[in-house]
UniProtKB/Swiss-Prot annotation:
Subunit structure, as described in the record: Homodimer.
Function per UniProt: Plays an important role in the de novo pathway and in the salvage pathway of purine nucleotide biosynthesis. Catalyzes the first committed step in the biosynthesis of AMP from IMP.
Any one GO molecular function term: adenylosuccinate synthase activity
Keywords: Chloroplast, GTP-binding, Ligase, Magnesium, Metal-binding, Nucleotide-binding, Plastid, Purine biosynthesis, Transit peptide
One Pfam family in the UniProt entry: Adenylsucc_synt
SUPFAM superfamilies in the cross-refs: P-loop containing nucleoside triphosphate hydrolases (SSF52540)
Protein name as it appears in the record: Adenylosuccinate synthetase, chloroplastic
PANTHER family per record: ADENYLOSUCCINATE SYNTHETASE (PTHR11846), ADENYLOSUCCINATE SYNTHETASE 1, CHLOROPLASTIC (PTHR11846:SF19)
PROSITE patterns hit by this protein: ADENYLOSUCCIN_SYN_1, ADENYLOSUCCIN_SYN_2
Length: 487
């Protein structure tokens, strides 16, 4: 049976307006939901206490330097876990990427915050947030984000440090990003148009400007002139004049004054904090399948969102890094172009997209949706050495008569592939072998104890653990902070 057997449920789900889970399929006879026996108050309190103890044990056991990394193509829900873990850490640090990352978190009152560059620990007053040298900084966007936070009562004063080694992302990088995509025509990458790739290109070709250059405005204009001329020589559609340069320099003089209190030698700050036994939580942007080296190249980002990016993006020694938590949706999504072996098309994909509200935080683009790809997940686990997984959006699968796991890839001739292929010609032709498991009908969004999950949901979680060889310690069953099960 496939997802198409429950397509008729979409209308009912839309009418219900829940936006959380699939409606239960009822092809022949109405399903009967047995009433749940209400537990005595004392037992309920005891269960809550056990859950709280398990949560405290899980979080307190994390190493001094821990990381939260994406293990698909992004949008897995990393920000929520970082937000939940942040109160137990002194510092939350971003190591790579820029405003192309979109992390959605909720405060204790349920107010939604969409962060792009500011680390997700910002909602916790005692947490210092660090944007490391591996990130790229669009200063106007950074200030817009801070202004938005402060207008909603979040104090950012003295709580964010930006590496003096981080590269500056200019509006010209964003313009070049759009021109580059237009030039590629039908083979475009599908970037966020935030200028990330062109900025990293400037970094690699060694004509980029860094945050520390804002302290030397006497030479800033000459360096920026090189960038403008480079873009103008490369793209006919890029207009450049000396007046544009003067305006941009004057603009950045104002930015430099405001940014100065945020600028720090974050390599020194972080390593000194490690010596002082402070706890550091690293928040990865994007995900391993978008890694410039290990992702589905060229449909990737321009940085390293895998474990290696922590060291190079923050200046932390490998021996200091302990627990790494891989965040993975209970199904798979992808924004933009590139191979997606388990993708669902037509009404099947639409149903999953609507139920999971799968639209990009940064771009608003509808995400491509499909079944959980175990081959890709296992590959990510191997690269990063995850100590545990956070399985998110399990509630979205509620109501399906069956759920599927893509457990292996076969070539067109039927030969099984032994690993995740780097060759896109091979990857685009693979035939996915699925393992079918029974679904569950009940709404699990209010469940807070693993033992209270339907048995079918528990089997799904445990089968994932068996297949990838990494334990699932955290299970997301809704968007709020409290919608998390500690296993």
């Amino acid at each position: 049976m496939s997802l198409s057997t429950v397509n008729h449920a979409a209308a009912a789900a839309a009418a219900a307006g829940s936006g959380k889970s699939f409606s239960a399929a009822a092809p022949a006879a109405p399903s009967v939901r047995l009433p749940r026996t209400r537990a005595p108050a004392a037992a309920a309190v005891s269960a809550a206490a056990v859950g709280a103890d398990r949560a405290a044990d899980r979080v307190s056991a994390l190493s001094q330097v821990s990381g939260v990394l994406g293990s698909q193509w992004g949008d897995e829900g990393k920000g929520k876990l970082v937000d939940v873990l942040a109160p137990r850490f002194d510092i939350v640090a971003r190591c790579q990427g820029g405003a192309n990352a979109g992390h959605t978190i909720y405060n204790s009152e349920g107010k939604k915050f969409a962060l792009h560059l500011v680390p997700s620990g910002i909602l916790h007053e005692g947490t210092l947030c660090v944007v490391g040298n591996g990130a790229v900084i669009h200063v106007p966007g950074f200030f817009n984000e801070i202004d938005g936070l402060e207008s909603n009562g979040v104090n950012c004063n003295g709580r964010i440090l930006v590496s003096d080694r981080a590269h500056l992302l200019f509006d010209l990088h964003q313009a070049v990003d759009g021109l580059r995509e237009a030039e590629l025509a039908n083979s475009f990458i599908g970037t966020t148009k935030r200028g990330i790739g062109p900025c990293y290109s400037s970094k690699v070709t060694r004509n980029g400007l860094r945050v520390c250059d804002l302290r030397h405005m006497d030479t800033f204009g000459d360096k920026l002139d090189v960038l403008f001329k480079d873009a103008a020589s490369r793209f006919e559609g890029f207009e450049y004049s000396k007046s544009m340069l003067r305006e941009e320099v004057e603009r950045y003089k104002r930015f430099a004054e405001r940014l100065e209190p945020f600028i720090a030698d974050t390599v020194h700050v972080l390593n000194e904090s490690i010596q002082q036994k402070k706890k550091i939580l690293v928040e990865g942007g994007q995900a391993t399948m978008l890694d410039i080296d290990f992702g589905t190249y060229p449909f990737v980002t321009s940085s390293s969102p895998s474990a290696g990016g922590i060291c190079t993006g923050l200046g932390i020694a490998p021996r200091c890094i302990g627990d790494l938590i891989g965040v993975v949706k209970a199904y798979t999504t992808r924004v933009g172009s590139g191979p997606f072996p388990t993708e669902l098309f037509g009404e099947e994909g639409d149903l999953l997209r609507k139920s999971g509200m799968e639209f990009g935080t940064t771009t608003g683009r509808p995400r491509r949706c499909g079944w959980l790809d175990i081959v890709a997940l296992k590959y990510c686990c191997e690269i990063n050495g995850f100590s545990s997984l956070n399985l998110t959006k399990l509630d979205v699968l509620s109501g399906l008569p069956e759920v599927k796991l893509g457990v292996s890839y076969n070539q067109p001739d039927g030969q099984k592939l032994q690993s995740f292929p780097g060759d896109l010609d091979i990857l685009e032709q693979v035939q996915v072998k699925y393992e079918v498991l029974p679904g569950w009908q009940s709404d699990i969004s209010s469940v807070r104890s693993y033992s209270e999950l339907p048995l079918a949901a528990q089997r799904y979680v445990e089968r994932i653990e068996d297949l990838v060889g990494v334990p699932v310690h955290y299970i997301g069953v809704g968007p709020g902070r409290d919608a998390l099960i500690y296993k």
